[in-house]
């Protein structure tokens, strides 16, 4: 017997000796192994500077906010399905639509662009990472912290912000909207807005300074061009919003009187907000135009039609979007109607050029309608309808009739949902093998598309008619005598179908992660054109083990189909 050891300690030593003799160490419980794996993943996410991991964090977080915003939307549509107040008070309804709009514009669509940019843009230009990796990580954590500040208003005694996502003065003041919810909204958007500005600087620096040898500006993919000009557009827009929000907080907490209505502050706020707000529409649109422009040539088996004109259209949209902000203010009577109306009509021209090029790429192409192409076509249909209604309300006489009605709600959802959500899912299905090395299931993807497409059209098409009949936006209630009940019920049914459409996608992601087969090649679609399809799926830490020669705007296609490339070159000569 060993002196000085307790019986329990002796038993432990004997078991260890048996384990050594049999060479079969004791197995760690499954739960403990899972906790260790999760812990390591959390540490890796918290400390990473890898642009791909940060991009995945952006995509996952923004999609989480998208789901939360969708839940808030379904709660609103539940209230509006029938006349009378069923579920919420007027104040609670105000909180729902305020946080819904804020999430969808500033916590979902904007960081979603940063997510796709982080993952894809360095691959497309042959860069090993972003120019400032640590700044990139800081930007993500600032976005997450700011977003949590905004939604944490629901946990305060007075509830979340309730003055609408564009927070018109004087309703945004502490007098009319007291409580910490408004302050959390204001400062949360300051933090997340600074994050977006820092990301824009990072993206511009990367595109200008870190392109691979041979990757000239006019060999860059259209997606990267759109990211460049989106980031340029962020630089004047977001600092204006940040400054306006800081002045608003000074009003609320320190009595600064910047936005007092007696001093013209109400109109000042509108000018400052919409000087940010309309460029913001294109900040969240241009990257998704780029995603669609990457997808259509691959499934048309053709190069993009009109590469240079697409770049020119992007430049024109960038500059025109900065001079149309006051078309949101026609009804104030305090803006130059002819100028802003003309500029609003004019911005439709470069957008029409893009449609011409997208359709021109498909004409006489060998089209195949895999899931990414379906989503791209859904984008074309939906965004076109939204753009047509936008041309209508660019006319001041029509805008006077339709402003602040459900026609505006329908228009903005056709433009923004039609662009961001349809192109987001197109990008997910297209680049998922590049993200993870596995293809999402095609059958589930098609179920997802058609369910969402039908749900979206059912929800928002009828809202044009509601607005034309005079139903105001942001009302929690209406009378049966108003005649809005039938269309509101249809819209609410569509909203729940829209919500249910997300379930096939979530199941598809889980099923692919658990049981999906590795694609095993650089380009699972077979006709990828840009440089990300010339590296493994998923890529290594610094993206490329070797770079192919870059002699055109389609380096991956040149690499994988040299015979076609040589034939095309001989044909051109």
UniProtKB/Swiss-Prot annotation:
Binding positions (Cu cation): 278, 282, 327-328
SUPFAM superfamilies on file: Cytochrome c oxidase subunit I-like
Cross-link (1'-histidyl-3'-tyrosine (His-Tyr)): 278-282
Source organism superkingdom: Bacteria
Keyword set, alphabetical order: Cell membrane, Copper, Electron transport, Heme, Iron, Membrane, Metal-binding, Respiratory chain, Translocase, Transmembrane, Transmembrane helix, Transport
Molecular function in Gene Ontology: cytochrome-c oxidase activity; heme binding; metal ion binding
One GO term (biological process): oxidative phosphorylation
Subcellular location: Cell membrane
Cofactor: Cu(2+); heme
Catalytic activity: 4 Fe(II)-[cytochrome c] + O2 + 8 H(+)(in) = 4 Fe(III)-[cytochrome c] + 2 H2O + 4 H(+)(out)
Binding site for Fe(II)-heme a: 100, 413
EC supergroup of this enzyme: translocase
Pathway terms, separated by semicolons: Energy metabolism; oxidative phosphorylation
TM region(s), chain numbering: 53-73, 103-123, 141-161, 188-208, 227-247, 272-292, 304-324, 329-349, 373-393, 412-432, 447-467, 490-510
Family: Belongs to the heme-copper respiratory oxidase family.
Protein name: Putative cytochrome c oxidase subunit 1-beta
Organism: Streptomyces coelicolor (strain ATCC BAA-471 / A3(2) / M145)
Name of the gene encoding the protein in the UniProt record: ctaD2
